[in-house]
């Protein structure tokens, strides 16, 4: 019976449902052994168990697939087992059991030869594949160990890096703390050195400056008698005076009880004795001239006096009189309303513009009249002088506005608030023009029927004097309160002062004008006969020549 190399197809009996049955590996091995050795020559079970122990156990593919699905972590081992089993079946010829096995088993004997050859081939292939499977398992184990070692190495590296980072952080913190401590030490050392230098400078200045006696000019710094400074005796003026102080009580009731706040008055000693020097406020004493320098206590504690023998003595009555005079003479500052304040500012501006110009215009008219000028010439001269004085007035205003750097503002004293400067200027200019035109207009229109020059001058003098006295009284009113005790005296003084000024100005101007007119006529500098000009009044009666000057 010839052996063929092709695979033997063995068919098993089909089930009732028509599905084929897959034979297990152990059953297949038993079947092959029975085909190879025969039914009677099958080796004992012990030998087969040894062979099974040495050989790898067959693995069912369905079980392997289920394990792969259930546990993904054992994929490598399952794949190796599946590869080993597939190699077992792939190297040998596949065996397909297609034959139907009858209950008698007659077909088994006819095909024993071919099955024996297939069994031998399968054993040889399984024996050759066993070491390959073991090698793969070893390799997989080694790979797992290598991976574990790498993971351990990575963990150790990460731990070492973390430790190094922590050490670096700790080192930086320590360095920062050390740096702060060094800076604090440097600052302390610098401050100590500065204090030492300041002390040295202070000691040096103390050595350079010494105290000298104001009486004998001797250096008394090294010979100073230091004494404690004690407070003097104080008396409360609102209460009854002590009986040990001699005070003469007046018959009339005193005003001491009516004082609102009590006044503490210093009662000095009558004489400074050697045993009573500690009671005074002595600071130092000159040993050469016996000069004693002390601070007076009580109401004049800020005054420093140096004396010989005894201090300045004052009685209690003097201090009370001073206090009473202070309370009666001084009045609290009055707050004026805006309307009254604005009216006072207008009066100030009127006085500032008209007072001086009235006196100036009076002098011009009196001097021109004394020189023999006509009425028309006097009026023209007065108006020209008035126009030229406006420039001077503007310059005075500019000086007042620029005088804000001084401690006492002259602008506010003479005119008022700076915010109302435009109104002040307007009122002052109007007053300047009005009071400046009064003397020439009075001279022109007074005694126009008679035309006597002396009468005209008297009328101009009286009109100007009234204007000046009025402006002087306004000046007193805006500078002093009306309810003061000396207001009447102030008005009288102002009237007398400005009357004297008007008289002096008018008299001096008249005298100088008369003298200059006579002197010019004597020199014949402007004589009418020399220049062949006839007078406009030539051949006219005196009664008809009264208004020829106009």
UniProtKB/Swiss-Prot annotation:
Bias (Polar residues): 122-132
PROSITE patterns noted in UniProt: HMA_1 (PS01047)
Superkingdom in the source lineage: Eukaryota
Coiled-coil ranges from the UniProt annotation: 134-165, 393-418
Chain segments annotated as transmembrane: 374-394, 425-445, 458-478, 500-520
Record keywords: Coiled coil, Endoplasmic reticulum, Membrane, Transmembrane, Transmembrane helix
Phenotype on disruption: No visible phenotype and no effect on pathogen sensitivity.
Upregulating conditions: Induced by NAI1.
UniProt membrane topology term: Multi-pass membrane protein
Places the protein is found: Endoplasmic reticulum membrane
Primary subcellular site in the record, as a coarse category: endoplasmic reticulum
Segments for region (Disordered): 46-199
Gene Ontology CC terms, in alphabetical order: endoplasmic reticulum membrane; ER body
Compositional bias annotation for Basic and acidic residues: 153-166, 185-198
Membrane keyword on record: yes
GO molecular function: iron ion transmembrane transporter activity; manganese ion transmembrane transporter activity
Family: Belongs to the CCC1 family.
Self-association and partners: Interacts directly or indirectly with NAI2.
Purpose: May sequester excess cytosolic iron and manganese into endoplasmic reticulum to reduce metal ion toxicity. Not essential for the accumulation of ER body components, including PYK10.
Name of the molecule in the record: Membrane protein of ER body 2
Biological source species: Arabidopsis thaliana
Gene, per the UniProt record: MEB2
């Amino acid at each position: 019976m010839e052996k063929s190399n092709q695979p033997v197809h063995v068919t098993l009996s089909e089930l009732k449902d028509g599905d084929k049955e897959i034979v297990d590996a152990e059953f297949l091995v038993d079947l092959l052994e029975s085909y190879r050795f025969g039914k009677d020559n099958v080796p004992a079970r012990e030998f087969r168990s040894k062979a099974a122990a040495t050989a790898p156990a067959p693995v069912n593919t369905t079980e392997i697939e289920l394990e792969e699905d259930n546990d993904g972590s054992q994929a490598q081992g399952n794949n190796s087992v599946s590869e080993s089993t597939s190699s077992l079946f792939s190297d040998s010829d596949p065996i397909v059991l297609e034959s139907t096995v009858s209950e008698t088993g007659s077909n088994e004997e006819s095909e024993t030869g071919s099955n024996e050859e297939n069994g031998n081939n399968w054993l040889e292939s399984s024996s050759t594949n066993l070491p390959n499977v073991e090698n793969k398992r070893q390799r997989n184990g080694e790979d797992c160990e290598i991976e574990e070692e790498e993971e351990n190495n990575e963990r150790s590296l990460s731990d070492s890096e973390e430790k190094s980072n922590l050490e670096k952080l700790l080192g930086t913190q320590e360095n920062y703390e050390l740096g702060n401590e060094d800076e604090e030490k440097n600052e302390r050392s610098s401050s100590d050195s500065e204090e030492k230098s300041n002390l040295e400078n202070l000691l040096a200045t103390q050595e350079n400056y010494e105290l000298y006696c104001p009486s004998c000019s001797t250096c008394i710094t090294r010979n100073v008698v230091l004494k404690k400074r004690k407070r003097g005796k104080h008396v409360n003026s609102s209460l009854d005076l002590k009986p040990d102080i001699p005070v003469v009580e007046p018959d009339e009731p005193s005003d001491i009880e009516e004082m609102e706040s009590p006044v503490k008055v210093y009662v000095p000693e009558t004489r400074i004795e050697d045993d009573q020097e500690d009671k005074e406020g002595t600071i130092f004493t000159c040993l050469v001239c016996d000069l004693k320098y002390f601070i007076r206590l009580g109401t004049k504690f800020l005054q420093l006096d140096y004396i010989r023998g005894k201090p300045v003595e004052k009685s209690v009555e003097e201090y009370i009189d001073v206090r009473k005079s202070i309370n009666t003479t001084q009045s609290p500052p009055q707050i004026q309303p805006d309307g009254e304040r604005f009216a006072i500012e207008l009066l100030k501006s009127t006085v500032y513009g008209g007072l001086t110009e009235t006196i100036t215009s009076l002098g011009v008219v009196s001097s021109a009249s004394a020189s023999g000028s006509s009425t028309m010439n006097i009026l023209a001269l007065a108006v020209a002088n008035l126009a030229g004085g406006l420039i001077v007035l503007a310059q005075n205003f500019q000086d007042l506005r620029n005088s804000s750097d001084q401690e006492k503002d002259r602008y506010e004293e003479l005119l008022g608030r700076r915010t109302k400067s435009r109104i002040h200027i307007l009122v002052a200019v109007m007053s300047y023009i009005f009071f400046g035109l009064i003397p020439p207009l009075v001279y022109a229109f007074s005694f126009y029927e008679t035309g006597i020059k002396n009468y005209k001058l008297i009328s101009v003098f009286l009109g100007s004097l009234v204007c000046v006295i009025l402006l002087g009284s306004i000046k007193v009113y805006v500078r002093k309160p009306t309810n003061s005790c000396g207001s009447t005296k102030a008005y009288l003084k102002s009237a007398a002062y400005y009357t004297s000024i008007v008289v002096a100005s008018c008299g001096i101007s008249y005298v100088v004008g008369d003298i200059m007119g006579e002197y010019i006529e004597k020199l014949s500098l402007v004589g009418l006969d020399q220049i062949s000009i006839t007078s406009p009044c030539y051949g006219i009666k005196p009664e008809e020549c009264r208004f020829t000057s106009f």
